[in-house]
Amino acid sequence: MREELIQGLLDFLNASPTPFHATTSLAMRLEAAGYRHLDERAPWHTEAGGRYYVTRNDSSIIAFKLGKRPVVEGGIRLVGAHTDSPCLRVKPSPELQRQGYFQLGVEVYGGALLAPWFDRDLSLAGRVTYRRDGKVESQLIDFYQPIAVIPNLAIHLNREANMGWAINAQNELPPILAQLASSETADFRALLAEQLAMEHDFNPDAVLDYELSFYDTQSAAIVGLNQDFIASARLDNLLSCYAGLQALIDSSDEETCVLVCTDHEEVGSCSACGADGPFLEQVLRRVLPEGDDFVRSIQRSLLVSADNAHGVHPNYADKHDGNHGPKLNAGPVIKINSNQRYATNSETAGFFRHLCLENEVPVQSFVVRSDMACGSTIGPITASQLGVRTVDIGLPTFAMHSIRELAGSHDVDHLVKVLTAFYSSPELP
């Protein structure tokens, strides 16, 4: 069972180089589990016992199953995560021809660790919008193969490279795609048209626009002498998306359960498909009772905001509070912050800790050092948007926001187990 779960995660990570592909991957798995797609632009006809999902912008997804018990009595069990990760995105007019090389100008998306992007075999994926037979359409593309690299400057030409060299994103990050003859001119949109023809078997009249990200082609892997770790891009936060999906599929059908995986968390969530937008509330208002009963249902509900936590690094242990250093493979972490950077309170933390104890899942706590700034999640955003009680949790991770992150392989079981118990729980606090 564990091997199957881990292999499923690796396959999901490899199939999801962008939020668009992650949403497609989640939708495919939901379809296989009997969930039916709902179109936001069409009327909905849902019923108790039904399983449904809806997407927005091709990059956010909400899946839910309507339980047998009325939500005004039992509330809703929600798990939230996000589909996006820090990366390098191609600019609208990206072509650069410098010293005979074809390069693409890129913009840094989110708070990326930039140094690990150098000397990697990079590919390109995302969504392309084009004109075809007089209509505007969109498709996902993925080059799959290594097509670009950002070479480092040799240490002989940069003797201070190992002493804290600052990276200039404008000048130093454009990847090299090809070497051009003096008579050649780079045309990125023509390249995209060729890729559309190869992947989807048609020739567009014109490529109009795109949202494309570079990604590392190295596959997700189990590493360590005892296979203790998962190394992959985008563990933050596709790991939580996958765990939430598995828990939703594995849980009982008695209660109403929701999985929400939104885009744009890494840049503030303020978008039509982000957690700071109306997506979740609009979906809930279409399937829950109206008026007073809607508020009653929300107030009986609980959200588990699942997003990776900072594991205590053996080489940098002083970056953590001495009493709050989460270890990899020691269970999910309850995140707490007095300034509401996390939405956890004593009641929601206590309930999650209770679930872990009841299901023999180890559990840890995280509080940022008092002299350091604290990050945040979709937890406080969703709590303030919806008025739902929330606990912020996540699995301990090294190298968060690097091109390749590290998490504990045993923690995947821990998280799926406790989230399944949460979805199946007959009582909420």
UniProtKB/Swiss-Prot annotation:
Q: Provide the GO MF annotations for this entry.
A: aminopeptidase activity; metallopeptidase activity; zinc ion binding
Task: State the Gene Ontology BP annotations.
Answer: proteolysis
Enzyme Commission number(s): 3.4.11.-
* Top-level class of the enzyme under EC nomenclature: hydrolase
A Pfam family cross-referenced in the UniProt record is Peptidase_M18
Question: Which cofactors does it use?
Answer: Zn(2+)
* PANTHER family found in the cross-reference section: ASPARTYL AMINOPEPTIDASE
Q: What is the protein's given name? A: Probable M18 family aminopeptidase 2
Organism listed in the record: Ectopseudomonas mendocina (strain ymp) (Pseudomonas mendocina)
